[in-house]
């Protein structure tokens, strides 16, 4: 039987151990995501903070070992008003990187304090997603 996918549930981002305040400042402050409670049943085994993003979660994992992020492995978040979003990130001191042009969208990257890339995209209205 072919799987019937309902939605993306979560992505996991790896960061160095002990950087909880930097994570909260970036993911909660810069990206504007809501932190949600981490299940107590997992707390003795894992060190994570969970953030809600639309209808999926971002699990930020402090559990060693930390792997150096790679630019080509990243989540992409679609936004409205990409220019305003970019100015907001810049006003908060977030690191911005340019992205190569793709004709049907505007995009750039924002990096968390540990080098994890997030692609920020605004699709042109007449394009299929």
Report residues per predicted region:
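Core segments of cupin and vicinal oxygen chelate
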Residues: 13-57
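N-terminal beta-strand motif that seeds the catalytic metal site of vicinal oxygen chelate
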Residues: 1-24, 73-75, 127-129
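Mid-chain, well-packed structural core segment of small domains
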Residues: 68-89
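Vicinal oxygen chelate
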Residues: 1-7, 90-129
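Short beta-strand micro-motifs in enzyme catalytic cores
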Residues: 47-49, 73, 104-108
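A short beta-turn/loop motif at secondary-structure boundaries
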Residues: 41-44, 66-67, 100-103
């Amino acid at each position: 039987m072919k799987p019937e996918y309902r939605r993306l549930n979560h992505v996991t981002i790896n960061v160095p151990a002990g950087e909880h305040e930097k994570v909260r400042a970036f993911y909660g402050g810069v990206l504007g995501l809501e932190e949600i409670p981490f299940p107590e049943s997992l707390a003795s085994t894992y060190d994570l903070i969970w953030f809600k993003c639309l209808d999926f979660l971002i699990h930020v994992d402090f559990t060693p070992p930390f792997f150096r992020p790679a630019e080509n492995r990243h989540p992409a978040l679609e936004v409205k008003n990409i220019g305003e979003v970019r100015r907001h990130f810049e006003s908060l001191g977030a690191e911005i990187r340019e992205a190569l042009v793709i004709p049907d969208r505007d995009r750039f990257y924002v990096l968390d304090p540990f080098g994890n890339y997030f692609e920020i995209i605004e699709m042109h209205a007449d394009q299929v997603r």
